[in-house]
Amino acid sequence: MRGFLMFTSGPFDIDFVVLWVDGSDEKWLQKRAIYSSTKQQNNAVRFRDYGIFKYWFRAVAKYAPWVHHVYLVTDEQIPNWLSIQNSKVSVIDHKSIMPEDALPTFNSSAIELNIANIPGLSEHFVYFNDDMFLNRQVTPMDFFSEDGLPKDSAVQNAIMPVEDFDHMTANNVMLINQNFNKYQVLRRHPFRFFNFRYGFLNVLSICLLPWPRFTRFQDPHVPISFRKSVFEKVLNLHRDAWNETSHNRFRNRNDNTIWLIRYYQLVTAQFNPRTPFVGKKYNIGEMKKIVNDINTGKHKMICINDQNVSMAEFDNLTKQLRSTFRSKLPQKSEFEK
């Protein structure tokens, strides 16, 4: 197992899966306009491209050279700089993983719930959004234990509804509560749910003990580790929910998300505890903090979340972002032409 602790591939293959869309692509915009309502057109902020995706690949090449394979899931889009001749990367079109009658789709929740259908995907894989970046050296042990369990943190939390997306979180928790007794889960696996690695966040779980059902888990916006067999099992247990979400072309209050599979891994103790502070989520408006974290490597992983800022401000912020990544990762990676 010594190799697993170093920067080698370890005793089993680990793949990376990342979703990406170029929201400025005219062909894609025309396709989206055919199916979208006015409200959905106004949600275009979710599809804005930062222009930094090549740095995602450069970070993988530099900080996780041990990764077995990278699967890029797109909708008939391939970055013009990506070297598709590289045997370590595969571009997966939605047609390869989604039901035919669900296409085209513009619902990331639907796409995420079907990534286990990727041909050739390894049993152990890590899922990234395209706004999640490796920020310094990582090892397989950051994502999986030596016996193949995903690394995660089972910190409990409560839903504080603000937007439609919170309905989806409630949908996930509802299915968990319908199938698992909270107190039985905690009694069987106390040290998975109350662990020194969680630090002061254990207080949240303690405060929620009087509630007889799960109210939510903390959802750190970092790459998530999965086992494909567990992913498939959960979806087969909830085929109706899977099918409904898969056929919602746009985000819908009735959707379930990939966090359902994560929650299942937690309540069945099919994970090993990891600090929840391994990564950090920033809103794009927090540019000073983002630049500092990128330059210092404070966190191993960061998420740079878009928010409702004007296009002028967005352009200025992404310009700073590109400059910062260019300085940190100036060399082309093996994934580029």
Swiss-Prot record:
<dbReference type="InterPro" id="IPR031358">
    <property type="entry name" value="Stealth_CR1"/>
</dbReference>
<dbReference type="Pfam" id="PF17102">
    <property type="entry name" value="Stealth_CR3"/>
</dbReference>
<keyword id="KW-0270">Exopolysaccharide synthesis</keyword>
<dbReference type="InterPro" id="IPR031357">
    <property type="entry name" value="Stealth_CR3"/>
</dbReference>
<dbReference type="Pfam" id="PF17101">
    <property type="entry name" value="Stealth_CR1"/>
</dbReference>
<dbReference type="InterPro" id="IPR047141">
    <property type="entry name" value="Stealth"/>
</dbReference>
<comment type="similarity">
    <text>Belongs to the stealth family.</text>
</comment>
<dbReference type="Pfam" id="PF11380">
    <property type="entry name" value="Stealth_CR2"/>
</dbReference>
<protein>
    <recommendedName>
        <fullName>Exopolysaccharide phosphotransferase cps2G</fullName>
        <ecNumber>2.7.-.-</ecNumber>
    </recommendedName>
</protein>
<dbReference type="GO" id="GO:0000271">
    <property type="term" value="P:polysaccharide biosynthetic process"/>
</dbReference>
<dbReference type="GO" id="GO:0016772">
    <property type="term" value="F:transferase activity, transferring phosphorus-containing groups"/>
</dbReference>
<dbReference type="InterPro" id="IPR021520">
    <property type="entry name" value="Stealth_CR2"/>
</dbReference>
<keyword id="KW-0808">Transferase</keyword>
